[in-house]
A protein has these predicted regions:
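N-terminus-centered regions that define maturation/targeting leaders and the start
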Residues: 2-7, 18, 31-261
Length: 261
């Protein structure tokens, strides 16, 4: 892997150039070689005026069996961490960011993208959730809202919208539904709520003693803690997750009617 870098001799600091243009991509005997040409901005502007011994040059680095996909995944993971921490999913819901991002797609065409804003109308129907699952393992899936009734006053934290256990090999449809899916129903004038999807890998098939909750009532949904649930069943930390935000729209009164509110 040949990468051209800008290296600035400033108290052992290294500045990577802002732009890289892919020029060549060849693969020979499992050795991937790429060549990049840097688009340079005068580097001296980044140094303090007190720096007198300024020196800049380019250097090349060759790395065999370099995984570009892993590099991209690390960069994406950093963005994911930033989103979950920026929006306080950590620590309001979980104590650490899951390593994997779950893919969540709604029948409306909406997708969940690490804190993007969707509408209750877009998320009213049960989504498809996928992750890198072991075919021989069982999983638990949860969707929960830590902002009930609002982020400012979350006295009902958490209000869980969906809970499925004993999911075989990532096939949610074959899992044991503990709480049927209910879409987002943030009250008016309460701002954006966070809706967090989390997947836990079970040690094996479990016996859950939770009351089964239908989707035509909001009873027993509030005051839930996914962290406490995970501790109760020794689920450990979530292996995958994602979240979106939503606020009140015209669908919410329809949902409330469905719930008998």
């Amino acid at each position: 892997m040949f990468i051209s870098r800008l290296i600035i001799n400033r108290k052992k600091c290294i500045f990577l150039t802002a732009y890289l243009q892919l020029l060549i991509h060849q693969q020979k005997k499992n050795v991937i070689r790429r060549s990049f040409l840097t688009s340079l901005v005068p580097a001296k502007q980044h140094c303090a005026p007190s720096v007198k011994n300024f020196r800049a040059y380019t250097a090349s680095l060759e790395i065999e069996n370099f995984s570009f996909d892993k590099y991209i995944n690390r960069k994406y993971s950093s963005a994911k961490n930033s989103a979950m921490e920026q929006h306080c999913v950590v620590p309001d819901v979980i104590s650490c960011v899951p390593e994997e991002t779950a893919t969540v797609c709604y029948p409306s065409g909406a997708t969940v993208e690490q804190g993007n804003v969707l509408t209750p109308t877009q998320v009213k129907d049960q989504p498809t959730v996928t992750w890198k699952a072991d075919a021989n393992a069982f999983y638990t899936l949860c969707m929960t809202d830590p902002d009930a009734p609002s982020r400012v006053d979350p006295k009902f934290r958490e209000w869980h919208h969906w809970l499925v256990g004993n999911i075989p090999g990532g096939d949610v449809a074959k899992g044991e539904v503990l709480s049927a899916y209910i879409g987002s129903g943030p009250p008016p004038d309460t701002g954006l709520h966070r809706y967090v999807f989390l997947i836990f890998k079970q040690s094996g098939k479990l016996t859950f003693d939770e009351k089964r909750l239908p989707n035509n009532s909001g009873d027993d949904r509030g005051g839930f803690k996914i962290a406490a649930f995970a501790k109760k069943y020794n689920l450990g930390d979530p292996i995958a997750g994602n979240f979106y935000q939503a606020e009140f729209d015209d669908y919410v009164p329809i949902l409330y009617k469905q719930l008998g509110a």
